[in-house]
């Protein structure tokens, strides 16, 4: 049984999302994005194709992450 939780109103095109990660409503994650284990992707976020996100990362509401960005483990990304 998977511990991955994706809200019904999220648009998640990627299959590369780790166990224990939660994706909230209105998040958009494009097909090529890679997201690690136990992450928290909040509402109204946008994650492009070549983004790589490590384990235990929190992406708060309203954060956009563009192609080419790599985020290490244990990072907190807050809005402006």
Where are these predicted regions, by residue range?
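Structural signal for interior beta-strand "rungs" in well-ordered beta-sheet cores
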Residues: 4-78
């Amino acid at each position: 049984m998977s511990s991955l939780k994706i809200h019904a109103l999220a648009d998640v095109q990627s299959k590369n999302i780790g166990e224990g990660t939660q994706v909230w409503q209105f998040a958009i994650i494009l097909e090529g994005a890679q997201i690690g284990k136990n992450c928290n992707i909040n509402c109204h976020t946008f994650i492009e194709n070549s983004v790589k996100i490590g384990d235990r990362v929190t992406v708060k509401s309203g954060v956009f992450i563009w192609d080419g960005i790599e985020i290490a483990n244990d990072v907190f990304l807050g809005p402006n």
